[in-house]
């Protein structure tokens, strides 16, 4: 979430810094981390439900997802709809249609709502993956996800649209990122039984691996090579990094990830992500960076405690503890 917000900063006082850092492509990396974590968590929850109850309830899953995601999301769309006639945003009423139906990863929308493409990809994943697990089982679904990882680089090369950056936002070219997280959840225990994997994951030099992959990606000017190879490698390294710090949260990084402020920020992260674009990339007003950041976290905190939390309590009452999120 922080990486994405940093990539959206467009203020005069920070423009030199952000333009210098942009070459690291940290915004896209932040979204990839989010997708891998999402695939891992959702698959883990569904597998826990299967183990606990003997089955996966599609109805229960969609109720839980709706209560978790939609209240705050549609509150954002409602606020933008009210702001349009007041000329507080650049968006038009037509820009609300694609986000309303979670398809803004295929249609270009105004700057204030452009970030909803990632939530559209996420929602499309929710529609497909639980059904795969129910119809085909965990093992065959995992094999299907693995096959998709193999063909995704080819899809990224073929899916080029000069009028809109479809390659970066389309479900078919981004789903392998989520699938990597799904495979981590499915094969995590089996991977841990491999001594080679354990040694790599627990090596003191392991934290240098993600950085090395990012540096390598920066140095490759050939877009075809990037699409065919490095993106997939980056997805795998993100998954390995998640596994590493879940199993062995030691050192400065582990301490930071488990610190109180970071844990609190993690619980709050959905709301800042929802509201950041309205302030950081407002098409009509360019507010000072500090004002925008304070406004984002004030609105996000209100959204979390007033809108999200009541629905989260309802979600928790509808679900066994083992399958809550």
What are these regions (language model features)?
Residues 2-6, 40-44, 78-82, 123-138, ...:
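Membrane-interfacial alpha-helical segments at the cytosolic side of multi-pass membrane proteins
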Residues 2-10, 82-85, 103-106, 148-158, ...:
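Aromatic-anchored segments of alpha-helical transmembrane domains
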